[in-house]
Swiss-Prot record:
Gene: PH
Role played: Major component of the virus occlusion bodies, which are large proteinaceous structures (polyhedra), that protect the virus from the outside environment for extended periods until they are ingested by insect larvae.
Cellular component terms (Gene Ontology): viral occlusion body
Name recorded for this polypeptide: Polyhedrin
Disulfide bond positions: none
Amino acid sequence: MYTRYSYSPTLGKTYVYDNKYFKNLGAVIKNAKRKKHLEEHEHEERNLDSLDKYLVAEDPFLGPGKNQKLTLFKEIRSVKPDTMKLVVNWSGREFLRETWTRFMEDSFPIVNDQEIMDVFLSVNMRPTKPNRCYRFLAQHALRCDPDYIPHEVIRIVEPSYVGSNNEYRISLAKKYGGCPVMNLHAEYTNSFEDFITNVIWENFYKPIVYVGTDSAEEEEILLEVSLIFKIKEFAPDAPLYTGPAY
């Protein structure tokens, strides 16, 4: 027990630090890294300043060009709980089916020169029974081996929930996409199968698509599978009309 007369070993060894001259080592390192990251970010932004004069659509489907819809087939599929069913498989019976339910929009037969900028596969899903409360799920793959044979039914593993209007839309464009066609209507009219094989799949990806639901019961889904062409129309050499409005 120490008294005021006892010798204290701490006497003469007490220091007072002024925080003005000392900083936390972790804060110093973090601040240096933060400054370096900001400098690198500013340098990257300066390199992209030249792109500010261009405009792009957040969703390529809503970008410039004319959308032309080709409905391939409509049918009802039964899906069991916790599973997803293969609904689009171009290397199997889906493409080799004997009858195709084809519906072409009236505006599709374009006879002028045009270019297919992108092709979207659209799968529209609707419940066949009223008063059902569940959401649709979907998965797809684009770069499959030509010899790959997908399973008819798979387990649900990290699927995507289908968004608004219960429509699942996939862009099939390759990296340097685009497919110039001189007369799209003639190519389609001559032979539908040749048009799909020689024009579309030579320039765009072949997808496989699985669909399902998060319902705990077996559900019947009405499917409408379509190809939507994003077409770039070339401007005519001379205006069709002349006047103050043009």
